[in-house]
UniProtKB/Swiss-Prot annotation:
Keywords noted in UniProt: Cell membrane, Disulfide bond, G-protein coupled receptor, Glycoprotein, Membrane, Receptor, Transducer, Transmembrane, Transmembrane helix
InterPro entries: 5HT5B_rcpt, 5HT_rcpt, GPCR_Rhodpsn, GPCR_Rhodpsn_7TM
Cysteine pairings via disulfide bonds: 127-205
The protein's role, per its UniProt record: G-protein coupled receptor for 5-hydroxytryptamine (serotonin), a biogenic hormone that functions as a neurotransmitter, a hormone and a mitogen. Also functions as a receptor for ergot alkaloid derivatives and other psychoactive substances. Ligand binding causes a conformation change that triggers signaling via guanine nucleotide-binding proteins (G proteins) and modulates the activity of downstream effectors.
Disordered as annotated region, ranges: 1-36
Residues listed as glycosylation sites in the UniProt record: 5
Biased composition (Low complexity): 20-36
GO cellular component entries: dendrite; plasma membrane; synapse
Keyword field contains rRNA processing: no
Official protein name in the record: 5-hydroxytryptamine receptor 5B
UniProt-recorded Gene Ontology molecular function terms: G protein-coupled receptor binding; G protein-coupled serotonin receptor activity; Gi/o-coupled serotonin receptor activity; neurotransmitter receptor activity
Major location category of this protein: membrane
Name of the gene encoding the protein in the UniProt record: Htr5b
Amino acid sequence: MEVSNLSGATPGIAFPPGPESCSDSPSSGRSMGSTPGGLILSGREPPFSAFTVLVVTLLVLLIAATFLWNLLVLVTILRVRAFHRVPHNLVASTAVSDVLVAALVMPLSLVSELSAGRRWQLGRSLCHVWISFDVLCCTASIWNVAAIALDRYWTITRHLQYTLRTRRRASALMIAITWALSALIALAPLLFGWGEAYDARLQRCQVSQEPSYAVFSTCGAFYVPLAVVLFVYWKIYKAAKFRFGRRRRAVVPLPATTQAKEAPQESETVFTARCRATVAFQTSGDSWREQKEKRAAMMVGILIGVFVLCWIPFFLTELVSPLCACSLPPIWKSIFLWLGYSNSFFNPLIYTAFNKNYNNAFKSLFTKQR
């Protein structure tokens, strides 16, 4: 297969033309999780340029950090009894999906990036397994973020009705729906003959390019959960704004008055001065709950913001590319894909940074190991 250099001044990094261009094929857009065009070694250039080594090193570090950090969170939740409850089961579900992304999806994606001509040489069966896990794990990771956002929303806005028993049932149901829906999206091509992932002639492994499946997979894996998390955070913002206004109205001013009374048995007048004051009806429990709600709202906001920044470039490309006669450089497709993968690295950093119990549990875990 003919390859072309990224630029004349950058040896060792090349990209194949053809199927990746929108103008070459009406269904050239790559569906969620498919093999990207990206960093591959040119047969006519030195096999290991400095830029290639740098990129590979960074991606290997990203894979290792994503795997180890999520594994640490998962082990902590399993070993610490205090974490055997909501919302830590949702965090555990997210950690499982992100561990699988780092262990099964990202390494083979890196191998595919570095293969000359992006040819898949591991066979049809392994191709189907890889693509299925790619779609399954990335979709589950995205929907788990939506589930965490929903749980925080109900906790903040309905803390009286959202009892511990209700919360357990809701979280278990959300986890079940997350993995069932992710499995349906991932296995639909195999179960219903919805396109083929492996092309033996071209030795190409990618998600089914069937246009109807592309719409189904991208909507189910990203656009629907995106709508959910944006709606949830808007409702959280409105609820926080309403509560702040209600607390301000709860501050009661007392007017300043002066009264004069005759002492019944004394020949003097007693003056009583009532000074102007404000009384806010707020207990220490309300203050603690308010601080907890603020941390939860901030955590959800950052989690959603990072989720959108990581995934929206990739999925916007997947939506626009099949509809226009344009050609996005393969290097950008790779950048957008790995930016999406990096969301699995940021997830545990965010939800542990806002919970001191995780930091204490990490310290305790390493102390016991010593």
